[in-house]
């Protein structure tokens, strides 16, 4: 399918206004540019869950900023944890705010969006350590937050999808964490950058291969890019992982590694579902102001997470 016209215009506008590549800019400017990108014209107007509260979650190196979203104050919903994208170097709970509001309303889950330490100031394994610490704390403190006690749904997009996948893998041997299912949105799964979809050009996608290469160098200083702690695609054992929903996009350099991971999970006996959205780009679920598929993803997530909880959408 052809690239969605609204997304094609978005890419053209980005290219026309790019004066320097990210690695040529101060990291503060990179982060500001990412914040400024998410305008209401792209994200859509923010819906209003009844409850939106900023939190601080204990982390391994100090408190982690987080935000709780609940569609109703008078109901204890299950917890869904969300880790934002941004290539490990940018992004945060503010950039994902509109999406998490939509997610809480559609899924009838209490969504907790968690910040983690960013590279290059805090390289690997800081983000993994923060994700694990937050999942462990939330697994045992749902009641304090007014949510339903029970196993979590772990979710994330892009770099955050990587953190969710790695945390789910670690949780199998960590009794502090109870994970019911995982929702991975265009997740980073292969630091070797070797899948065929990496050939997509900058005029076809929002995150070309050279941007990914820079993100990975900022985050991970190790020589083994097949380490399961950064590349879940190369994990030697995937058995026993929680059920997974993996969402990919046709015009995304990460598309094929997502498809490969689905096959590996299926071979390991994991319940997994995957949808590749035609005509879409990386991060499209955040772009409700541009494409209707953004809401389709939220509804797909709601259908995936709710049967196991007995909640009717």
Language model features: what each stretch is:
Residues 1-68, 310-313:
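A glycine/proline-hinged amphipathic helix-loop "lid/cap" segment
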């Amino acid at each position: 399918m052809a690239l969605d016209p609204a997304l094609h215009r978005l890419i053209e506008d980005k290219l026309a206004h790019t004066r320097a590549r990210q690695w040529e800019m101060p990291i503060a400017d990179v982060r500001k540019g990412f914040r400024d990108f998410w305008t209401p014209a792209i994200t859509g107007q923010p819906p209003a869950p009844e409850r939106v509260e900023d939190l601080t979650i204990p982390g391994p190196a100090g408190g982690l900023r987080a935000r709780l979203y609940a569609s109703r104050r008078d109901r204890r919903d299950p917890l869904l944890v969300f880790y934002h994208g941004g290539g490990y170097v940018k992004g945060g709970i503010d950039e994902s705010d509109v999406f998490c509001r939509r997610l809480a309303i559609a899924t009838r889950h209490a969504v907790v969006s968690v910040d983690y330490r960013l590279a290059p100031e805090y390289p690997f394994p800081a983000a993994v350590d923060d994700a694990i610490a937050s999942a462990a704390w939330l697994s045992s403190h749902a009641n304090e937050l007014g949510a339903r006690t029970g196993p979590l749904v772990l979710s994330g997009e892009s770099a955050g999808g990587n953190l969710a996948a790695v945390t789910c893998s670690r949780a199998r041997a960590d009794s502090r964490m109870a994970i019911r299912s995982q929702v991975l949105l265009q997740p980073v799964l292969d630091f070797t950058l070797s899948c065929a979809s990496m050939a997509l050009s900058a005029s076809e996608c929002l995150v070309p291969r050279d941007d990914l290469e820079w993100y990975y160098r900022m985050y991970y200083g190790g020589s083994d890019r097949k380490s399961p702690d950064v590349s879940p695609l190369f994990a030697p054992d995937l058995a026993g992982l929680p059920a997974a929903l993996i969402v990919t996009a046709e015009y995304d350099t990460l598309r094929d590694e997502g498809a490969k991971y689905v096959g590996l999970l299926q071979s390991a006996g994991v319940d997994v579902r995957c949808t590749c959205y035609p005509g879409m780009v990386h991060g499209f679920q955040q772009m409700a102001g541009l494409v209707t598929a953004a809401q389709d993803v939220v509804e797909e997530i709601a259908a995936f997470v709710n049967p196991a909880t007995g909640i009717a959408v």
